[in-house]
Amino acid sequence: MSKRPGDLACDLERSLPALASLGTSLSHSQSLSSHFIPPPLEKRRAISDVRRTFCLFVTFDLLFISLLWIIELNTNTGIRKNLEQEVIHYSFQSSFFDIFVLAFFRFSGLLLGYAVLRLQHWWVIAVTTLVSSAFLIVKVILSELLSKGAFGYLLPIVSFVLAWLETWFLDFKVLPQEAEEERWYLAAQAAVARGPLLFSGALSEGQFYSPPESFAGSDNESDEEVTGKKSFSAQEREYIRQGKEATAVVDQILAQEENWKFERSNEYGDTVYTIEVPFHGKTFILKTFLPCPAELVYQEVILQPERMVLWNKTVTACQILQRVEDNTLVSYDVSSGAAGGVVSPRDFVNVRRIERRRDRYLSSGIATTHCSKPPTHKYVRGENGPGGFIVLKSANNPRVCTFVWILNTDLKGRLPRYLIHQSLGATMFEFAFHLRQRVGELGARA
């Protein structure tokens, strides 16, 4: 009589230590799990990073004009007398006070429109720039500022340039980038609306591929003995070093399971955690129970990546570029586009180290470079942080195992970070779903 899923999960929890693994990259699923539905509009971040930078620049405009005006006031006759002359006895022809007021007008109008009201239209800055430009041109023509020396030239020019820089920044940076983020958000919502777990293909743009029978790291064989069997070039030694460092980071994450932060779980018992890794940032961890022998997952996910392409349609190409030694290799992977074309295809070059230990199978890796696959204009080159896949054997039942995927990836490009984080967990759930389907099919054939 078979055990209930809950009982199997309990058996697994009693038998498994801290786990980890490296997922080399993100290839967004065409459908997001309902457990990671993007937040509603009212709960999204109030102001984007690029808009906040724009508001800081507007503040700089006011402060810089104010500083120049104060310097101009602080002449031989004293700042108090000059301030009285320019403000109380204001004269359009000779006073700089109106240029300061103009800067304050831009500051208040732009912050009201784009920080307080968070408008997504250019009409506010069109008004402020038009008023500023017209006023400054008229003032330069009709006033006597040019007879006042350097500041007669400097203040109008600086004010004019800053006004147009603000226009350029909003029109070419803020609004286009926020529109792209909005497309991301709507694409994610549309994907969720189509229903979770209905597409063919899981995620993982940079899956760890290693040739069959090329595992190493047995309990009785040291790294020095393995590497001592062959003379390596400087580049090959660097690949081996990178692979060992990635494995060391994975082992450190394993030792800190109590510090994993719970994020989400689903009805299958899959759980996503996060942890902050020094120098590498936020790392996502998927832990899932599989009702199959660990060796089956080891073969499908780690040793035979070509099989993964059959059931993971988001990976369009995978190639082993170089086999450095038995347990170190360099791979090249290409992911398909996702989210209705919002995310363009990414390619990845990874160095991977594969080890077989008493209680687990481990594939760890990190981004690297290779002379045969330089970055091209065809794809955006993504970059993976250290992590890996781990297949954990059960001490009590050889017919079950636990699969753990640690994912630390940078997709590059102008992608909103908060939305990437929202979709990463959903992507990991999708991968677990299709992996479970795959091992179920293989088990039925056996």
UniProtKB/Swiss-Prot annotation:
Reaction equations catalysed: cholesterol(in) = cholesterol(out)
Alphabetical UniProt keywords: Endosome, Lipid transport, Lipid-binding, Membrane, Phosphoprotein, Transmembrane, Transmembrane helix, Transport
Post-translational modification: Phosphorylation at Ser-210 is necessary and sufficient for the direct interaction of the phosphorylated FFAT motif with the MSP domain of MOSPD2, VAPA and VAPB and allows the tethering of two membranes that participates in the formation of ER-endosome contacts. Phosphorylation of the FFAT motif leads to conformation changes. Additional phosphorylations around the core FFAT motif (QFYSPPE) are not essential but strengthen the interaction with MOSPD2, VAPA and VAPB.
Transmembrane residue ranges: 53-73, 96-116, 122-142, 150-170
Chain ranges for the short sequence motif FFAT as given in the UniProt record: 207-213
Cytoplasmic side of membrane: 1-52, 117-121, 171-446
Predominant subcellular localization, coarse grouping: membrane
Localization: Late endosome membrane
Biological process (GO), any one: cholesterol transport
Extracellular side: 74-95, 143-149
Gene encoding the protein: Stard3
The protein's name: StAR-related lipid transfer protein 3
Function, as annotated: Sterol-binding protein that mediates cholesterol transport from the endoplasmic reticulum to endosomes. The sterol transport mechanism is triggered by phosphorylation of FFAT motif that leads to membrane tethering between the endoplasmic reticulum and late endosomes via interaction with VAPA and VAPB. Acts as a lipid transfer protein that redirects sterol to the endosome at the expense of the cell membrane and favors membrane formation inside endosomes. May also mediate cholesterol transport between other membranes, such as mitochondria membrane or cell membrane.
Domain of life: Eukaryota
Protein family (similarity comment): Belongs to the STARD3 family.
An example Gene Ontology molecular-function term: cholesterol transfer activity
GO annotation, cellular component aspect: cytoplasm; endoplasmic reticulum membrane; endoplasmic reticulum-endosome membrane contact site; endosome; late endosome; late endosome membrane; mitochondrion; nucleoplasm
Chain positions found as Phosphoserine: 210, 218, 222
This protein's domain notes: The FFAT motif mediates interaction with VAPA, VAPB and MOSPD2.
Native species: Mus musculus
Record-annotated MENTAL domain positions: 47-218
